[in-house]
Amino acid sequence: MIIYTTEVEDINSFYTLESLKEVYGIIWMLVPILTLVLGITIGVLVIVWLEREISAGIQQRIGPEYAGPLGLLQALADGTKLLFKENILPSRGNTRLFSIGPAIAVISILLSFSVIPFSSRLILADLNIGIFLWIAISSIAPVGLLMSGYGSNNKYSFLGGLRAAAQSISYEIPLTLCVLSISLLSNSSSTIDIVEAQSKYGYWGWNLWRQPIGFIVFLISSLAECERLPFDLPEAEEELVAGYQTEYSGIKFGLFYVASYLNLLLSSLFVTVLYLGGWNISIPYVFAPELFEINKINGIIGTTIGIFITLAKTYLFLFISIATRWTLPRLRMDQLLNLGWKFLLPISLGNLLLTTSFQLLSL
């Protein structure tokens, strides 16, 4: 059998073309993921800078001002410092669990960002069960914290890990019941559909007004899930040194630091999506019909406006969370568990029953 040179060249060119298609396909899959990671990183840096500036203002002192203009690069400088510090492993601890714990905490939170809609056409994964996927993934993070506490072979770390697991379980259930109420109101578990269901009457269509009890419970549960004051018992400095982070140093300690702010940003975004109308403009149609038409703009301009509105609402909630941290004292462990099991759980369950009753009556 004789194969001519031209035929061999055609076969090679076809093979090369198919390989290029696969490479381009992989690249186009990675572009939105890397863009989202870059945006999340910038968002975390902004939150760290905001927290330092707001806390400095509340305490009447000067915040960061030397690293970059207005101290904007201070968080980047701190991250670089942690990156080059020595990574110390506990001699009598379980090094595998000790090393895996921070990674589980960060990855579980990062995966949850995939179902966040920043605009009507800007979402990484529009799933029918998007909101419950977030609940399922976020429940993995406490496992990483418990592994970190156990793997450290330190009594303070282990107690901090146990506290983190108990706190997460206590407040995950009221949070899930509030999300279920929103899903019933919107007749969908997709984050896109939930935002679209709030888009008819400006801010009067927000779930904040239809679910005020659920909003308050969700707000408190979100702060508890983020382990922010007054719910920072897993890492209470006066009692447990630094909780499950006691034995960590270098980049692994930095991962826990990043995970806490990632969780805060994620919770703020879900408050915006579930209760504050997402990317929709807040002006009611009866007041300014021409502004209400912004919701219908497509393309790059519409996407940019949607991102700006979403982030504006998100950082409003972030400001409330940061101000709360520097205003309220820490709860005791028994008070924290009583609040979750004896108050928030019955209230969220009653809210769900009321929502279900109204939905059945409206059929």
From Swiss-Prot:
InterPro entries: NADH_UbQ_OxRdtase_su1/FPO, NADH_UbQ_OxRdtase_su1_CS
Keywords per UniProt: Chloroplast, Membrane, NAD, NADP, Plastid, Plastoquinone, Quinone, Thylakoid, Translocase, Transmembrane, Transmembrane helix
Signal peptide extent: none
GO cellular component: chloroplast thylakoid membrane
PROSITE patterns tied to this protein: COMPLEX1_ND1_1, COMPLEX1_ND1_2
Class of this enzyme: translocase
TM region(s), chain numbering: 30-50, 98-118, 129-149, 248-268, 300-320, 343-363
Domain of life: Eukaryota
MF annotations from Gene Ontology: NADH dehydrogenase activity; oxidoreductase activity, acting on NAD(P)H, quinone or similar compound as acceptor; quinone binding
Reactions performed catalytically: a plastoquinone + NADH + (n+1) H(+)(in) = a plastoquinol + NAD(+) + n H(+)(out); a plastoquinone + NADPH + (n+1) H(+)(in) = a plastoquinol + NADP(+) + n H(+)(out)
Topology in the lipid bilayer: Multi-pass membrane protein
The protein's name: NAD(P)H-quinone oxidoreductase subunit 1, chloroplastic
